[in-house]
């Protein structure tokens, strides 16, 4: 499984000759992404409707160009009206391609005062596990802590806190429940620094708790080898 990190929580997963784009959002977006990076897309997964995860204008162009399907919640569908949408919900498990399955996980977006009045409250939030038969990658979406017994090899999750998502301490607790072979922090490119985690503190806590991790730059790609993890 090959993983490329893009803006905020966006990931491009390449496996079994398929290209799966997760949460293409508007933060740090450039036209090069649409024109050269987010090309030949076979499926798009969207966790929730906030624009840093769902840049509707660009997603519609990708769908039209590549004729790909979008797997997302009914709330995203209500606001975005994408063509080729497959509506999914928590606990669904779907084989989207031969030997590639997605599992739809629980996710609970945090709430700040005023989000409901400004129509930014997230009612329906989901995460995804991509399983290609060899590797399981779990991207959590913007979620606060909850009990779970999800299993994965690669865990992609936020640590920025601020009442909206997992912070560093509760994020470590969340990660230890899952015990991944590799953790990739996401959701760290907000233009306001106060909305991003303290990277040095995050590294210290991950290392103290013995969690193997990789902090990826935008555009960076890794090939995950379950037998030889050396990041």
Give the role of each language-model region.
Residues 2-5, 24-31, 53, 84-88, ...:
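Short gly/ser/thr-rich secondary-structure transition/capping motifs
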Residues 112-176:
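Active-site-proximal loop/helix segments of hydrolase catalytic cores
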Residues 12-49, 56-61, 111-119, 143-149:
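Pre-active-site segment of Zn-dependent metallo-hydrolases
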Residues 4, 81-96, 172, 176, ...:
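Binuclear metal-ion centers of metallo-dependent hydrolases, dominated by the metallo-beta-lactamase
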Residues 21-25, 41-52, 70-74, 137-141, ...:
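Active-site neighborhood of phospho(di)ester-bond hydrolases with catalytic His/Asp-centered motifs
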Residues 27-29, 50-54, 77-80, 92-95, ...:
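Active-site environment of divalent metal-dependent phosphoester hydrolases
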Residues 33-97, 101-111:
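Active-site HxH/HxHxD metal-binding segment of metal-dependent hydrolases
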Residues 1, 14-20, 93-103, 131-137, ...:
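Beta-strand-turn-beta hairpins that frame and shape the catalytic cleft
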């Amino acid at each position: 499984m090959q993983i490329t990190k893009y803006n905020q929580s966006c990931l491009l997963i390449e496996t079994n000759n398929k290209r799966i784009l997760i949460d293409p959002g508007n933060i740090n977006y450039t036209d090069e992404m649409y024109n050269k990076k987010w090309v030949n897309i076979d499926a798009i997964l969207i966790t929730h409707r906030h624009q840093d995860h769902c840049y509707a204008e660009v997603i519609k162009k990708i769908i039209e160009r590549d004729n790909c399907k979008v797997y997302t919640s009914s709330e995203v569908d209500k606001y975005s009206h994408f063509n080729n949408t497959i509506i999914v919900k928590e606990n669904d498990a779907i084989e989207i391609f031969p030997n590639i399955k997605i599992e739809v996980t629980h996710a609970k977006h945090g709430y700040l005062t005023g989000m409901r009045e400004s129509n930014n409250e997230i009612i329906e939030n989901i995460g995804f596990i991509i399983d290609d038969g060899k590797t399981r990658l779990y991207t959590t979406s913007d979620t606060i802590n909850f009990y779970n017994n999800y299993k994965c090899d690669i865990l992609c999750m936020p640590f920025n806190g601020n009442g909206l998502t997992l912070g560093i301490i509760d994020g470590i607790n969340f990660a230890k429940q899952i015990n991944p072979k590799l953790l990739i922090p996401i959701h760290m490119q907000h233009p306001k620094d106060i909305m991003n985690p303290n990277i040095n503190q995050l590294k210290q806590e991950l290392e103290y708790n013995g969690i193997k991790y990789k902090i990826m730059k935008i555009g960076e790609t890794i090939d995950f080898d379950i037998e030889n993890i050396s990041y």
